[in-house]
Amino acid sequence: MLRLITGRAGAGKTAQIMDEIRRAASEHEGGRCLLVPEQYSHEAERELARVAGPSLPLYAEVLSFTGLARKVEAELGTGGRRPVDAGGRLLCMALALDSVYSRLRIYAGARRSPELQGQLLAAVDELSAAGFTAEQTMEAAERAPGALGQKLADLALVMGAFHAAIGPEHSDASDRLSELLRRLPESSFGRSGHIYIDGFTDFTGVEMKLLCELMSRGADMTVCLTLDALDEGSEVFELSRRTARRLLREARERGVPSRVETLEARSVRSADILAEHMLSYTEQHFDSDNSVFLYTAESVTAECELAASRAIELARSGCRWRDIAVAVRSF
């Protein structure tokens, strides 16, 4: 069963699934997993432990996609392959460029540029995250016109040479999720229980394939997505809307039952109204709840001083620095 829980920010999606996990733990029902983005995993684990209590680890766990890969590796083993660290990856990229630089039309100069080597490594990571192999990238290069096709062809050559430099006896971090996708059918994970997914706007190509594999394995799956409506609505939520439609389509194609639950926000906040109408230049007026303030300043310097003073004031009142953001158009 695939269940989508949708609603605007503050509607209570996260609170609902955490309460469901808490109730399952209190009834001694195991097999609950909360899948969240890597950067949110520690905070989610702390919050879930606060809600569910000290018995939580017996019945539920919080994982990122990388954490799920580690869990499956612990179950099935690594096959004797040793992971390559960051320094080793850079060395392998340098070796890869040495082997193919004479065939490169755009990135031949990267052979003597450590900075460009790092950028090529990031490009290889992006392609791997999207589920592209060197062969598929070369096929895309043949269809792309002009300079774009040449760049993709170079990336395909570099990608193939990089994986050859890594070798079969080592594993690369960029291929970790692809390896997880390949080995997941052998694992017991997801054959029962309930998988909750929260904190995502969309998924990479490999992550989406993993979700499709998981929803077909027997465990129930609940995905929380922040959006106003599934059919149409604000452009702000378009990415989440496409993700929801894709998940429902994949479930339908696999014969997996699905349903959508929409949670209404408890109250409309000024911040929500600002997010909805900030760029629409409407003449509508709204009552403020004193959470949004509009200031004018004589200069950019004065604007910066005001922003800095407000940030310091918030920090001194107990707000964490990491919860304060300064957004600018351009200076």
Question: What is the role of each PLM region?
Answer:
Residues 1-4, 99-199, 206, 231-235, ...:
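Accessory N-terminal region flanking or inserted into the helicase ATPase core
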Residues 28-146:
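Conserved P-loop NTPase-based nucleic-acid remodeling module centered on helicase motor cores
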Residues 69, 83-93, 114-118, 141-145, ...:
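Short, surface-exposed, charged/polar-biased interaction segments
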Residues 38, 59, 172-175, 326:
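N-terminal low-hydrophobic presequence detector
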Residues 74, 78, 164-168, 313:
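General structural signal for alpha-helix termini and helix-helix connectors
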Residues 1-47, 187-192, 196, 201-331:
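Conserved motor-region signature of P-loop NTPase helicases/translocases
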Residues 42, 46, 63-66, 70, ...:
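Non-catalytic, well-ordered alpha-helical scaffold segments
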